[in-house]
Amino acid sequence: MILDELLAIPADATTATIQGVEMQIISADQADNMLEADTNDEKTHECILKNGRFLFESENGELKALYKVHI
C-alpha cells in the first residue's frame, strides 16, 4: 500500500524508489501549482505525513509519479 511505503521514507531522504518510481524533490510552489491544476483531484494526490509532504500521481491504481515537497 502506498501509504505504508511513504511512511517508510526517512524524513531527511532526498532519494527513494517506490513501486519502481523514483521520488523527485519539488518546491512548495510547484506542489501548490500541481494541486491547483488538478481541481477535481483526479490525477495529483497529496499526503501530509510525519516524515514529509508528498504528492503522487496514479493511473488505474498504478503509481506514475512521486514527489516530495522540499521545505
Question: Can you describe what each PLM-predicted range is?
Answer:
Residues A8-P10:
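Long, charged/polar, surface-exposed segments that mediate recognition or autoinhibition
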Residues T15-I71:
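Acidic, low-complexity, intrinsically disordered interaction modules
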